[in-house]
Design a protein with these regions (language model features):
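Structural preference for solvent-exposed beta-strand-turn elements
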Residues: 1-248
Length: 248
């Protein structure tokens, strides 16, 4: 055992762990405290979800990573006030003064990230329009974004291609829809959840993704006042509500 551990240690010090097996001599009780930051895949979507609330949200244990900084910048150009909380890693997100943003500002903050597509549902509810910059390959006809756009159209959104990106409007508001995804896409499932929670009527989503971050996003939306149930066989039902509150 000791020789294997020493071998792994030497390998790790030089070029990284290269052995295909590591023997651990257990039996020694472990104790202590570690700080666990929020999961990236959930934190950024929770930040976007704050746009749906009519009161501020408090998000705890936010990791200081590039994706979080991108979403923070996008929220701020849309008028959301983002401030540090009392504890390290706390963010307070206040959407009271949400407003439309210029395409150039969205593009500057988004970089190559596709996160702006998830802003569409919340912004359509709040402002009646949303913009997606040309993200280099993120275009109509590109399958990943097409799933999002097709879902938004099912809710009643109108999608227009502009030289600088995509403009999405909801001239008659958003209404519940029956949607079946071509495959259980995590991003498209998040899109439907973020859009359906305040759409009029009931949305039935079939072939939904059911990864842990989806369940966590559902829990956050439910905490805000959304009515969502997860059924067998990858079916999610969402009953739209008129208003949502912030989460803590």
């Amino acid at each position: 055992v000791n020789s294997l551990v020493k071998e792994a240690s030497r390998a790790g010090e030089s070029v990284g762990l290269t052995v295909d097996r590591l023997a651990i001599d257990g039996g020694i009780p472990l104790k202590g405290r570690i700080e666990v930051r929020g999961a990236k895949n959930l934190v950024t979507k929770a930040m976007v979800a704050s746009l749906l609330g009519e009161t501020p949200s408090l998000l705890r244990s936010v990791p200081d990573i590039s994706d979080v900084r991108v979403v923070r910048g996008l929220l701020e150009v849309h008028g959301v006030t983002v401030t540090e909380g009392a504890e390290p890693g706390d963010l307070i997100l206040d959407p009271t003064n949400v407003r439309s943003a210029h395409m150039a500002d969205i593009d500057a903050h988004a970089g190559s990230s596709r996160i702006p597509i998830l802003f569409c549902g919340p912004l359509l509810h709040q402002l009646g329009e949303a913009f997606i910059p040309d993200l280099g390959g993120c275009r109509i006809g590109d399958r990943p974004i097409d799933f999002h756009l097709d879902a938004l159209r099912r809710f009643g959104a109108v999608v227009d291609k502009l030289p600088s990106g995509i403009r999405i409007t909801a001239p008659h508001g958003l209404r519940g829809a029956h949607i079946e995804l071509p495959y259980p896409s995590v991003g498209a499932t998040e899109q439907v959840l973020l859009t359906a929670t305040r759409a009029k009527g009931i949305t039935e989503l079939r072939n939904a993704a059911i990864e842990p971050e989806i369940m966590d996003l559902i829990a956050i939306l439910q905490k805000m006042g959304a009515i969502i149930s997860v059924e067998p066989n990858r079916v999610i039902l969402i009953e739209g509500v008129d208003k949502l509150d912030g989460y803590t």
